[in-house]
A protein has these predicted regions:
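Conserved "HGTGT" condensation-loop signature of ketosynthase/thiolase-family condensing enzymes
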Residues: 1-87, 104-111, 115-253, 258-260, ...
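Internal, well-ordered alpha-helical segments in soluble enzyme and binding-protein domains
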Residues: 98, 172-176, 375-378
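Conserved phosphate-binding catalytic cores of ATP/NTP-utilizing and phosphoryl-transfer enzymes
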Residues: 96-104
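Oxidoreductase and adenylate-handling cofactor-binding alpha/beta cores
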Residues: 380-387
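Gly/Pro-rich active-site capping loops and adjacent beta-alpha segments
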Residues: 404
Length: 508
């Protein structure tokens, strides 16, 4: 006897992805990429009337063009007159957050059909700028009202952090990487080989993904060795270890209730049930975190997502962990219980992701990293993966800032054993966790916590995290050639040093 389903259960019924890579294809502006991804999602669903009947149109913040109301621009293109128009602020976590909350809205009866989409035309915009041209894309009237905003508008860094160079993700995630290497007790060379192997495995996955931007598999050495095509960005990250935002891509998902899917004529084999979603934010400023290579918020959100779905790490077959940089993937894998937090004779580390790949797309270097919208691509690909492996469970994570903001989603072609979608936001628990104070006035003895070397056009500098004798964090820098060489060839974490009044760090 078939299980009777709650007609309010939220399901993903359609996904769409678009990529414009070849020069012969006319480029599209972001709003049209979003709309076309939604059209493809409706076709994918096999149903009708989903776009025109959408209750909510939600868009992921786009950076390659500015619309006064991107959700309205998309709604007009797909013929929708929704009750709710909303757009996220900047944050790679927010596509995941919107999906998690959309599922909760549908389960609660607040909506029947919600469409979520995002798109970036960064490569086209960059090429136009390089040629001294402006994009002839649509501009909304000044009379158009701004949409509802989803997400946290706080600046990711404070004035002190900004002054000390703790600004760009591509400079901060390497600090996480070095701190993680030290915690695991890995050698410098051995660690480089391991993250190269992880990313090489990601490139293999991308080679089979028809929606991936770069589909040529690369070896570990091709990824980690600097070259003219693969410059060093910030030690230990080369260009091929960083997210690739120079893409023209769009992705979309359509989420409905079971009842709405049946009314629209969506075949049962297109349904993917959302089982659980959880979201949480770590201490906002990196300066205040207890360490640089963990994420209590992701750990807590993951715990809740597992519990609400009545599943554990061993029950998950398919993963797509947020992959802006290798440290994000590794921290995610540790916090979700997929690999050990310590390097016990190399167990679970050298083969990270070998038995169960940690990506279904190939990751943000190879599949593409369209700024805030990667997670929509990851979820769309996960839906296809689950449809092709009926009954299996998939897990997607979303990450914004500097492993700051997180969302976790669990889904399957089978309905949730709990009989309903469940959602959690354990923010109060995370906020109550210990925090570290920062002392930017400290001079004297410090212990190095992490260090990277930032490679700029004609110069290099080291960005350094240290701890004072009282345990406070103090940021520092160095342009000394010997210090920078040591940072890239030896283990400086735990080394004693001196911090001057201007933040310069010198080894004892």
């Amino acid at each position: 006897m078939a299980l009777e389903l709650d007609p309010r259960l939220p399901i993903i019924v359609g996904t769409g992805q678009i990529m414009i890579r070849d020069a012969a294809t006319e480029p599209l502006e972001p709003a049209e990429l979003m709309a076309e991804a939604l059209r493809r999602a409706e076709t994918d669903s096999g149903g009708t009337g989903l776009l025109t009947g959408a209750d909510q149109v939600l868009t992921v913040s786009e950076l390659s063009w500015r619309y006064r109301n991107p959700a309205l621009a998309v709604a007009e293109r797909i013929g929708a007159s929704p009750r709710r128009l909303a757009t996220s602020v900047v944050g790679g976590n927010l596509a995941g957050v919107m999906v998690a909350r959309a599922a909760a809205d549908i389960q609660a009866g607040a909506a029947d059909v919600i469409v979520i989409t995002g798109g970036e035309a960064t490569r086209t915009r960059s090429r136009l700028r390089k040629a001294g041209l402006e994009a002839a894309w649509s501009i909304q009237s000044d009379s158009v009202e701004s949409p509802e905003s989803i997400g946290d508008l706080r600046p990711l860094v404070n004035e002190m952090e900004s002054a000390r160079g703790v600004q760009l993700p591509v400079h901060v995630y390497p600090l996480f990487e070095v701190a993680l290497r030290a915690r695991l007790g890995l050698s410098v060379d051995g660690h480089i080989e391991r993250i190269g192997s992880l990313w090489s495995a990601f490139s293999e996955v991308a080679s089979t993904n028809l929606n991936a931007w770069l589909r040529t598999p690369l070896s570990s050495s091709e990824i980690t060795t600097p070259s003219a095509e693969n410059r060093m960005i910030a030690w230990p990250y080369t260009k091929r270890l960083c997210s690739n935002n120079q893409v023209d891509q769009g992705a979309a998902v359509i989420i409905t209730s079971v009842a709405a899917a049946e009314r629209a004529g969506v075949p049962r084999d297109r349904w993917v049930f959302l089982h659980a979603g959880a979201e949480a934010i770590d201490h906002w400023n990196v300066s205040n975190r207890v360490d640089l290579c963990s994420s209590p918020a992701l750990r807590t959100a993951g715990r809740d997502a597992y519990s609400l779905a009545e599943r554990g790490p061993d029950d998950i077959t398919h993963f797509d962990l947020y992959s802006c940089f290798p440290s994000a993937v590794q921290i995610g894998a540790i916090e979700l219980g997929l690999i050990p937090a310590t390097n016990v004779n190399g167990a679970g580390w050298g083969g990270i992701g070998a038995s169960r790949p940690l990506t279904v797309t190939g990751g943000m270097t190879f599949a593409g990293g369209p700024y805030n919208n990667y997670v929509t691509h990851g979820l769309a690909t996960m839906v296809d993966t689950l449809r092709n492996d009926a009954g299996s469970m998939g897990l997607c994570t979303a990450n914004g800032g500097y492993t700051t903001e997180h969302a976790v989603l669990l889904a399957s072609t089978e309905p949730p054993t709990a009989g309903a979608y469940r959602h959690s936001n354990p923010q109060a628990e995370v906020d109550a966790l210990p925090r570290v104070e920062c002392d930017d006035t400290w001079t004297g003895d410090v212990v190095i916590e992490s260090a990277t070397v930032v490679f700029e056009d004609v110069s290099m500098r080291s960005l350094i995290a240290t701890r004072t004798p009282e345990g406070q964090r103090a940021w520092g820098m160095s342009t000394d050639a010997d210090f920078m060489d040591a940072a890239m060839t030896t283990e400086l974490v735990g080394a004693r040093a001196q911090r001057s009044a201007n933040g310069t760090i010198a080894l004892d």
